[in-house]
Curated annotation (Swiss-Prot):
Spans through the membrane: none
Entry keyword annotation includes NAD: yes
Residues noted as binding NAD(+) in the record, renumbered to the chain: 32-36, 81-82, 113, 136, 173, 290, 314
Gene expressing this chain: ligA
UniProt cross-references to Pfam families, sorted A to Z: BRCT, DNA_ligase_aden, DNA_ligase_OB, DNA_ligase_ZBD, HHH_2, HHH_5, Nlig-Ia
Binding site for Zn(2+): 408, 411, 426, 432
One GO CC annotation: cytosol
Family membership noted in the UniProt record: Belongs to the NAD-dependent DNA ligase family. LigA subfamily.
Name of the protein described by the UniProt record: DNA ligase
Reaction(s) catalysed (UniProt annotation): NAD(+) + (deoxyribonucleotide)n-3'-hydroxyl + 5'-phospho-(deoxyribonucleotide)m = (deoxyribonucleotide)n+m + AMP + beta-nicotinamide D-nucleotide
SMART domains tied to this protein: BRCT, HhH1, LIGANc
Lineage, top ranks: Bacteria, Pseudomonadati, Pseudomonadota, Gammaproteobacteria, Enterobacterales
CDD domains: BRCT_DNA_ligase_like, LIGANc
Keyword Transferase carried by entry: no
């Protein structure tokens, strides 16, 4: 049996290894929850045996040593970490400790913030001018990232307003909105660049570039949450007051900061944020709860690595470790072959996960994944679970290589990978049962033709029984034929037939989206429908003319042109129209005749809107003569930026495109 000293040494060595991977290499090997568990185990042992605590124990310091490639900045005031709680009982115990330590009847008010999942930084302003910036590093010394921080547009290079201190060190989190993270990885997969496991790693990797020009291209943003150095000036005597003052000076502060008068209000805030988490547009892993009064903070003081007046209340882990039992290959509606990891079932963020996407062959190679490996699984919001990384230090001896198929696992056709593309595809087309099934499921989906009651299992049976080969065949189905399907009685069958009849009346945009043309999503379909107005005009369009549509480049234009050039596709469209599929005649909007500040402009919406839905905003803009695009380009005239706007806002600023916020949009809509 190991001695206490051996257990402590082993735990400290393991934690230091993972701290180095997380803080220095930006390549964590284990989930945060596993790190937290190890840290709790170490802290509990040290609490029982305080005589064995060493000055270099992970419980006594923060982070890891800085990279040698950066010069170093010593923090004048140490950048400490926060203690964590993981459930209501632990938070209430923390609340009681605070009340007991203050030993007074004075009320405690809590300032609650989002716990952003990014990289902690300190930014020093002298006479209102940004002079330096550093990472947290080991809490005492960080890396000099001044040049990179200066490229982040959310961070002012000069504060504005009155009574700015002579020296002010602001602390906060640099992070990457989810939209920006997805765009970076999408570009990386296309070009063979580095794919990041999550937004936190992407933010850290972007901020710690030796070339600031690379950082400048990444849509990083920033929220401040505290103060380090303060000289030659004053700040309010509450934490919230300080954040509001920062905002007046031009520093970005989250609008979700909330003052809570009791522990019950704090718990309500925690649960509301947890509920809103999937819609925020950026990653958080909990909430931070701080005593609002600076005087009370001073009374409470600090322990070795954290303040006694604050705590991080973390959400259930979104990452867990498990084993890959097998890798199977699925075929999508465009023939894309997607590897899927079959996992030893594990609960992640409250959901039992047994499968995770592996994206493509490049991703398997990047991960170095083998069947039998121990892996970290991540599930965030509604995102499909994915393998974040392989725990190489715990690789079993009997793992097997993952062999990507050369023939379709469904129809046996050749698998082809076009040069420059990450995706391998089955060449079978509609002779492939899997492609046929997925194409039909897309066609009847809610945002396409919206056939109520026609679920995936019905489509599967229709294809397997050879009742349906093309979308047009769906409209030839009778209640009698449907009744022969599993779990389909006469009433249900008639309901499906009625839903198919109702679906015949649609819109041109929905119809185009339902056809499943490669790279044509809802926004692009709407843009094509608005620009060409009729099916005949779209079918006759050249690749050059297609590129005049907002959001349509050479790749999408080629896919659209090739789709309509294919005789079998034109035949399916003719059959659909013959079965009665139709849509209203286009209403031609002449922008020149509309008296509106949006008339004739190409507009892009980004971030979340609070006063109206995105669909309502799009519809209103189109009514006023705007063309609404899905991405920012040189053709864009105006960007409307809501909360947590990401890469689109950064690109607009880079291109010098006019940007307005939601308040200004509403004013102009009403003018």
């Amino acid at each position: 049996m190991e001695s206490i000293e051996q257990q402590l040494t082993e735990l400290r060595t393991t934690l230091r290894h993972h701290e180095y991977l997380y803080h220095v290499m930006d390549a964590p090997e284990i989930p945060d929850a596993e790190y937290d568990r190890l840290m709790r185990e170490l802290r509990e042992l040290e609490t029982k045996h305080p005589e064995l605590i060493t000055p270099d124990s992970p419980t006594q310091r923060v982070g890891a040593a800085p990279l040698a490639a950066f010069s170093q900045i010593r923090h004048e005031v140490p950048m400490l970490s926060l203690d964590n709680v993981f459930d209501e009982e632990s938070f209430l115990a923390f609340n009681k400790r605070v009340q007991d330590r203050l030993k007074s009847n004075e009320k405690v008010t809590w300032c609650c913030e989002l716990k952003l999942d990014g990289l902690a930084v300190s930014i020093l302003y002298e006479n209102g001018v940004l002079v330096s910036a550093a990472t947290r590093g080991d809490g005492t010394t960080g890396e000099d990232i001044t040049s990179n921080v200066r490229t982040i547009r959310a961070i002012p290079l000069k504060l504005h307003g009155e009574n700015i201190p002579a020296r002010l060190e602001v602390r906060g989190e640099v992070f990457l909105p989810q939209a920006g993270f997805e765009k970076i990885n999408e570009d990386a997969r296309r070009t063979g660049g580095k794919v990041f496991a999550n937004p936190r790693n992407a933010a850290a990797g972007s901020l710690r570039q030796l070339d600031p020009r690379i950082t400048a291209k990444r849509p990083l943003t920033f929220f401040c949450y505290g103060v380090g150095v303060l000289e030659g000036g004053e700040l309010p005597d509450t934490h919230l007051g300080r954040l509001l003052q920062f905002k007046k000076w031009g520093l970005p502060v989250s609008d979700r900061v909330t003052l809570c008068e009791s522990a019950e209000e704090v718990l309500a805030f925690y649960h509301k944020v947890e509920e809103d988490r999937p819609t925020l547009g950026f990653d958080i892993d909990g909430v931070v709860i701080k005593v609002n009064s600076l005087a009370q903070q001073e009374q409470l003081g600090f322990v070795a690595r954290a303040p006694r007046w604050a705590v991080a209340f973390k959400f259930p882990a979104q990452e867990q470790m498990t084993f890959v039992r097998d890798v199977e290959f699925q075929v999508g509606r465009t023939g894309a072959i997607t590897p899927v990891a079959r996992l030893e079932p594990v609960h992640v963020a409250g959901v039992l996960v047994s499968n995770a996407t592996l994206h493509n062959a490049d991703e398997i190679e990047r991960l170095g994944l083998r069947i039998g490996d121990k892996v970290v699984i991540r599930r965030a919001g509604d995102v499909i679970p994915q393998v974040v990384n392989v725990v190489l230090s715990e690789r079993p001896e009997d793992t097997r290589e993952v062999v990507f198929p050369t023939h379709c696992p469904v129809c046996g056709s050749d698998v082809e990978r076009v040069e420059g593309e990450a995706v391998a595809r089955c060449t079978g087309g509609l002779i492939c049962g899997a492609q046929r099934k997925e194409s039909l499921k897309h066609f009847v989906s809610r945002r396409a033709m919206d056939v109520d009651g026609m679920g995936d299992k019905i489509i599967d049976q229709l294809v397997e029984k050879e009742y349906v080969h093309t979308p047009a065949d769906l409209f030839k189905l009778t209640a009698g034929k449907l009744t022969g399907l599993e779990r389909m009685g006469p009433k249900s069958a008639q309901n499906v037939v009625n839903a198919l009849e109702k679906a015949k009346e649609t819109t041109f945009a929905r119809f185009l989206y339902a056809l499943g043309i490669r790279e044509v999503g809802e926004a692009t379909a709407a843009g094509l429908a608005a620009y060409f107005g009729t099916l005949e005009a779209l079918e006759a369009a050249s690749i050059e003319e297609l590129q005049k549509v907002p959001d349509v480049g050479i790749v999408v234009a080629s896919h659209v042109h090739n789709f309509f050039a294919e005789e079998s596709n034109r035949n399916v469209i003719s059959e659909l129209l013959a079965e009665g599929v139709h849509w209203p005649e286009p209403i031609v909007i002449n922008a020149e005749e509309i008296d509106s500040p949006f008339a004739g402009k190409t507009v892009v919406l980004t971030g979340s809107l609070s006063q109206m839905s995105r669909d309502d905003a799009k519809a209103r803009l189109v009514e006023l003569g705007a063309k609404v695009a899905g991405s920012v380009s040189k053709k864009t005239d105006l960007v409307i930026a809501g909360e947590a706007a990401g890469s689109k806002l950064a690109k607009a600023q880079e291109l010098g495109i006019e940007v307005i916020d939601e308040t200004e949009m509403l004013r102009l809509l009403g003018s």
